């Protein structure tokens, strides 16, 4: 690599581990250029085992090691962590936060004037290198900081730079979205079992159907409605199934789920 990128994770959970593995796999950092801090022994052990990187129980040790800090703790832990590291954070460092609902203003306020901050919303498919990520730059973050965020999070999926005002919607859609999809997979699999299929076959058929459908949507660029029509023959089986879904209000329920999760994200950002 042309420049040594040192990365410190404040929090060593599953998402931090997935990110570290993605960065290493994409040759954005070597394992010895990464450190993760966490008070929980088991979390540190898992991070070290899976990412091959060093760990510590001290947030300040991670802070002093890294040029780029990834804040990967739960939202209700952010204030305490910022209070601990804020006095030692320098303008030469960049903080990237993946804490859901925690605003740039709160992050910048906790680190002091001049802090370079980026707020990021990945999702759990980062664990398999297939995250849908959006990020917003803080007022002091540079264009180069934005390029770095794009490079880092493209290593684990796709990434989009947006205005911060849209990140709550991202949380409601792609942040919470995997859970909606898993519920759909479970329900379709149950339907397959009810129709006589073995559970393992029904689940694998369903998951592959979702995967293949998503791949077609991404690779063809066609509107989902057009792709739906490609499957739907006049008077056939698919239109009967779609009719039942429409009668049950599935479309509206999914839209409402995104709206509800978006509003919850806004409340989290306000400390509610």
Predicted features, each with a name:
Residues 2, 207-272:
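NAD(P)-dependent Rossmann-like dehydrogenase/reductase catalytic/cofactor-binding core
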Residues 34, 62, 107, 198-205, ...:
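Small-residue helix-packing motif on alpha-helices
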Residues 118, 167-172, 224-229:
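Short pre-catalytic strand/loop immediately N-terminal to key active-site residues, enriched for Gly-Thr
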Residues 19-20, 85, 188:
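Hydrophobic residues within alpha-helices
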Residues 35, 41, 51, 59-135, ...:
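Rossmann-like NAD(P)(H) cofactor-binding subdomain of soluble oxidoreductases
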